[in-house]
Amino acid sequence: MNFCDNNEMNETKNFMMSNKNDDIVVDCDEYIDGNVFEKNTNMGNIYDENYNVDMKNDNLLSKLNDNISFTYTTNGQVEKQENEIKEKQNILHYQIYIDNDEDKYKYCSNSNLHKNEEEHEKGSPNNIYEELDNNLEKKYFYYNSDSKHCIDEKNETNDLENENVVTSMDVSYENVLNDNFIKSRSTSINYTDNSFVLNKENLKSSHHINGYYINDHDNIKSDIINDHDNIKSDIINDYDNIKGDKINEYDNIKSDKINDYDNIKSDIINDYDNIKSDKINDYDNIKSDKINDYDNIKSDKINDYDNIKSDKINDYDNIKSDKINHYDNIKSDKINDYDNIKSDKINDYDNIKSDKINDYDNIKYNDDSQINNNVSNKVNSPDDDPNTYEKDKKDIINCNIYEENKNNMNNIIHNDKENIHMVDTGKNEENNNIDNKNNDDINKVNVLTRVDTENYILNEENILPLHTNDDVTKLLDEINDLKNTIENMKKEKINLLSKFKAYTLNNKKELEELKIKCKNKEEQIKMYENKLQNKEDEIMNYVNEIQNKDKKIESYHIKLHNKEEEIMNYVNEIQNKEEEIIKYVNELQNSDVQKEKKELKTINEVLKNTNEKLEKEITSLLGEMKKIEEENKVLKIFKEEKNKINNEKVTQIKGDDINDDNDMKFKQILLDNKTFNKLLVNELNIVEENILFCFSIDKDKNRLLVCIKQNDDNFFVIPNCIFDEKFPGLQKKTESMIIQDIHEKEILELKNKQMNELYILKKEKEDIYKEYEEYKKKVTSLINETNYNYKNIEEKENEIKELNNTLNKYKEEMNNYKEEIIVINEKYKLLEIELCKEKNIRDQQNVGISDLKKKMLKEKIELEKKYKEQYEKETQQKINDMKIIFDNKEKILQDQIDDLLHKIEKLTFSNDEKTKTIENLQIYMDNDDNIMNQEGIQKNEKKQIIDNPINTDEKDLLNYIPDNHINSDLNHINSNVENDYVEKRNKNNVHLSKKETNYQHNINEQENDNNNNNNNNNNNNNVEKLKSINSTNTSIPIYPYEYKKIRKKLETYEILLNEQQEGKKKMTEEINSLKNQVKNYESINGNYQHIIYQKNILSNFIAQIPSRIQVDDYVSVIFNSFNFSNQEIEAINIKRSKK
């Protein structure tokens, strides 16, 4: 079975099994709609069964495009002991195997069934099948590229009365959640279930077939039917063996006449075999051509075949009934003579036959009642008919043919169990072969009956004149040939119509496939565009981060400049202090020594205090410097980490696509495999305590997976929808159990902590700046104090040296900061280069996408043109071929009709000739009245009864022996008729050969139209001829009954020709309608593409309008008029917000 993308298929299968006594009809309906698979089987005359299989799965059947195989096998052993059937073992094996590019699914089940034998109230054997010991094994196997699932289940029931059921299950998962920490998992369950009980009342629901009760299992029914057929075949073989002995005795009696009959029959059969071999070769050649298109036209051909078969069977029955009645009337006279001669021998034969048949009836079963009725009818029928032997022989042949066909079908079914597609084709071929064989047998019977009538007519040479019978037989043969040609024309017409339908279906399918491919490619392009947009957004985020970092670097530069300015201020202040110190030194040199000593003491004391204070302040400044250095180190580390993160993000962009695909596949596996999850959930017992946690798959958190614990060792993951269906009473604490919510809460807490820490750091920085300002104030105050107290130069020089050292350190740090800034600038330039490269790559991708779109459009246009041209050419060729074929066949039929009209005109004669023949008859009858005896009169009456279609007056004409002059006239007339007929036949043959040579050259439409006009003119001429014949009363036909038949057949031929012309007109109308549909489709496609082009222009124009400008009233009209989707509107609004 092939599942198309439309996910809709309805297929019906009809099988017919025929037996000597009854017929069995089997209907099999298969229907698929969406995700439901239904299979219905009905068998008439045995039992009625409705077997429904519902496979409800989200996306399982919609993905099955490659292969599906259902296998159903039964294994049984049958023994025959004392006319009873004992079934030792019956195994039911059911297997479903689904294979696809993405998914594979396999289901196997085995069960053993045993039989319980009881006795009926009346004592008749009653076979009731019960599942007393049921060993059931199931295997599930499902895997795809990401995960594998295997389940082995065993169900053993030993005692139905104790109601104990023991089941065991082994489950194994590999890479189920597609996580790093969960690679495989296996569980095993062993439990007993007392609720699973098989009631005997339910098990005894059975169907009655010929005295047997059979349980509702297909395998048991099929085995019993096969056994029944085998028994029937054995009985028929025994009957044939008994009958053979009788037939040998009867053959010795009838050897004289049968030898003649066999010689005639052998010649006919040889001719029939030669014709059959030619037809089989032609059939095989045609079959090889048709097998390729068989799958596409299967449903149409089956329906056509059934209709044709029903029509043929009805025609065959009507023809056969007429021929059989005619044959029986002809043979009735011979049979009476034959019975008078051999009555004694037949009576002996009847006595022997009755004894043997009584023994045979004691052997038969109750099931073969119909066979007994047939045999009894044959025994009780009067043996006066010598035709009993031939009827029995035909029945035997039909039985053998049925058995051979049945054996062939069974062999083919056993050989083709594995491939269901080959089985279907094989069955259809066998059905066709069976129909051909049945048709061949029917033709054999027709040939035999026709030969018997001809032999009977040839044996009556002394009574009927030869020349009249020859004309009649030739006319009959020609009529049969015309019938065959008409039937062949019908068949060819049906075949051509089916081929034309198949061709149109193939073209439609190819166009649909191309459309689907184009849609898939457009969706892929949209996916790539979305990915590019996401990457552009990520790049914009990176650019914003880099800009923020640039701003931070500029702020650090500003801080450094401020620090440099402060240092320069300190240097200027120190220089000013030095100058002041020099002034103090000069003043001291001019002052007195005493003053100096006193002042030195005071200065020393002050300097000690100041030195202590300065030492404390210097230590505090050194601590602050260390803090600043630590902050610089932290900033360096932060920058390095940010650079690493940026590089990792660039590398992760490529890996995210692969992980996203794997995640999507895994999600689809977990959500799509509902049947697998349902099988697990049906066997679980869950309490609210066993629910561990939930895991959301969608962003909106609508689709959840529930993790369940059972027996502390087994864990299961089930979709939320299946959990709610199977356990509606249980409540899930979704707010506290969803893992994503927990992690999101933790992330929020961490973010809050980080924000608090940043806030604290900012406060600390502000406090440090405040302290620094206070420190500045203190330093100024101290400097003012030192201006009055610095008098010791040596100490001040040491301080100056220390300050110079500190300055050198600051300069070194400044150089280091400058080097770091240079490195950061280089990295920034590299990032800019990478951004430029990515932009170039994006531009190249956009160019490539635009080129792909253009190529797609070109390919679409080219493919549509190609297929249109091919379709128009092929349709025109086929139409021309059809017209030529029908025109040529019409010409042939018209020629044959003209021949028949010519013959009918020659078979008639005028009223003058009729009056002459009547006078001669009166004279002849007056002379011969005294000579005729009573026996002769009786014989003539019998012979007149045999000749059904000939009237009494015309019979006298045929029995009359005319004078020599009249005989010469008649012979002359007959010879002229024969010569005309031969000349006409030769002309027709020559004409046909010329037509066959000119078929290939005359293909133009003008010539076909001329042929049609000529055919119409010929038909009108034929009608006028017939009217003229009807209007004139001068000619009277010799054989009015046959003349009426021929006239009716000619009228039917004219009706058929008119019907064929009407069929041609209908064909042309259908072709024109198909062309109009193609044109409409092209116009619709062009309008759709134009609308999409306008839509893209409007969307780009609206996206360029910034969000500040309010244009909602105008834009909403455009959105509603062009049917913009919500996603497209959101994308346009995003672009507007950016601008």
UniProtKB/Swiss-Prot annotation:
Top-level taxon of origin: Eukaryota
Coiled-coil blocks: 472-648, 758-877, 1043-1084
Region (Disordered): 366-388, 1004-1024
Biased composition (Low complexity): 1009-1022
Keywords: Coiled coil, Merozoite
Biotechnological utility: Possible candidate for an effective malaria vaccine as determined by epitope response in sera.
Residue ranges annotated for the GRIP domain, each copy included: 1084-1135
Biased composition (Polar residues): 369-380
Name of the protein: GRIP and coiled-coil domain-containing protein
Organism annotation: Plasmodium falciparum (isolate 3D7)
The organism's taxonomic lineage, starting at the top: Eukaryota, Sar, Alveolata, Apicomplexa, Aconoidasida
